[in-house]
UniProtKB/Swiss-Prot annotation:
Protein name, entry field: Phosphoglycerate kinase
Gene symbol of the encoding locus: pgk
Gene3D superfamilies reported in the protein's UniProt record: Phosphoglycerate kinase, N-terminal domain
GO biological process, any: glycolytic process
Signal peptide: none
Residues bound to substrate: D21, F22, N23, R36, H59, L60, G61, R62, R113, R146
Family statement: Belongs to the phosphoglycerate kinase family.
Catalytic function, reaction form: (2R)-3-phosphoglycerate + ATP = (2R)-3-phospho-glyceroyl phosphate + ADP
Pathway(s) per entry: Carbohydrate degradation; glycolysis; pyruvate from D-glyceraldehyde 3-phosphate: step 2/5
A Gene Ontology term for the protein's cellular component: cytosol
Gene Ontology terms for molecular function: ADP binding; ATP binding; phosphoglycerate kinase activity
Binding-site residues for ATP, renumbered to this chain: K197, E319, G345, G346, D347, T348
Length: 392
């Protein structure tokens, strides 16, 4: 790795500042999903085992910067962490002037977004945060695409900055899939809009042998192939781009299996009746909400040949059971595959949970925006600063 990892650093008797991603759902003062907290435990436990003191920082939600708002407080998260790790977790509401913590102890700082200068990563705030510790550990891949005070600025001014266990695992999995994949490689890019995934599609074209599109993205490609998509969600102004991608794929020998059949409905509703049709038979008052059985078979067959699979986004409105068959078939094809598989993005994780294939996916990324930017080939500021620090 081109940056220091947690295991490269002496942590004994050090105050260790850890940027975690504890942006979790909280209802009535209780954390309702502990997945992101559990993901940070290996890093926290390792620091404690090495004789360090742990100071945790995270954001929660989108409060107005500089204003305290109890609904965005991390106090319930500190309680949830204490239950999971079976140790006391002190909570520091006002922490910028210093944190009282000894080796073997854990302190959870209040929401970093209550601090003026967090989003702009001001030097003043970054230096203040850096002065609280001896070592900075970046372990929040989900925020690595943001140059903020608690993810980027602090790393500039603290003596030692490194990657935590979760961040290291995320990058290793993504680099294995993108930079040194075992071929053939398949990527699934689903979701509602081509516009948000256009650069992802273009960046993946010269890396994959199979590129599967789904959801509203697939509808734009169906339109690009000259078929009517009726009342479906698609982007008219990006049909030309989709046509270009199809032409580029053909020239590169990349297989983009645009759906040949679909499940349509007259209305966007959970109770809408699903009608299976060839794409050429979709009429004006119908909307495409899922791929059809023939398309499912084609995708499943293609995925059998893959040795690496990258998955971002569903292929239909899987939240509605009548239109979940395509994403279910895709999930099962990935689960049954021998390939190294990496999945990421909120909807993708929800699909993995719905269809119970968590243990059959090689690596599930906790990130959304950062995952997409990595797929686009963009540099992530919070990772770049770790690389710079390793050279100094």
């Amino acid at each position: 790795m081109s940056f220091l990892t947690l295991k490269d650093v002496d942590l004994k008797d050090k105050k260790v500042l850890v940027r975690v991603d504890f942006n979790v759902p909280v209802k009535d003062g209780k954390v309702t999903s502990k997945v992101r907290i559990e993901a940070a435990i290996p890093t926290i436990q390792y620091i404690l085992d090495q004789g360090g003191a742990v100071i945790l920082m995270s954001h929660l939600g989108r409060p107005t910067e500089g204003e305290y708002d109890s609904q965005f407080s991390l106090e319930p998260v500190a309680k949830a962490l204490s239950e999971i790790i079976n140790k006391p977790v002190k909570f520091a509401k006002d922490w910028l002037d210093g944190v009282d913590v000894k080796a073997g102890e854990i302190v959870m700082c209040e929401n970093v977004r209550f601090n003026i200068g967090e989003k702009k990563s001001t030097d003043d705030l970054s230096k203040k945060i850096a002065s609280l510790g001896d070592v900075f550990v970046m372990d929040a891949f989900a925020t690595a695409h943001r140059a903020q005070a608690s993810t980027y600025g602090v790393a500039k001014y603290i003596p030692v900055a490194c990657a935590g266990i979760l961040l290291t695992n995320e990058i290793q999995a993504l680099e294995k899939a993108l930079k040194s994949p075992k071929k053939p490689m398949a990527a699934i890019v689903g979701g509602s809009k081509v516009s948000t995934k256009l650069s992802v599609l273009n960046n993946l074209l010269d890396k994959v042998e199979i590129l599967i599109v789904g959801g509203g993205i697939a509808n734009t490609f169906i339109k690009a192939e000259g078929f009517d998509v009726g009342n479906s969600l698609y982007e008219q102004d990006l049909v030309a781009e989709a046509t270009e991608i199809l032409a580029k794929a053909k020239a590169l020998g990349v297989n983009i299996p645009v759906p040949v059949d679909v499940r349509v409905a007259k209305e966007f509703s959970e109770n809408a009746q699903a009608i299976i049709k060839k794409v050429s038979y979709v009429v004006a008052d119908e909307m495409i909400l899922d791929i059809g059985p023939e398309s499912q078979k084609i995708i499943a067959e293609l995925l059998k040949s893959a040795n690496t699979i990258l998955w971002n986004g569903p292929v239909g409105v899987f939240e509605f059971d009548n239109f979940a068959e395509g994403t279910k078939a895709l999930s099962l094809a990935i689960a049954q595959s021998h390939a190294f598989s990496v999945a990421g993005g909120g909807d993708t994780i929800a699909a993995i949970e719905k269809f119970g294939i968590k243990d059959q996916v090689s690596y599930i990324s906790t990130a959304g925006g950062a995952f997409l930017e990595f797929l686009e080939g963009k540099k992530l500021p919070a990772i770049e600063i770790l690389k710079e620090k390793a050279i100094r």
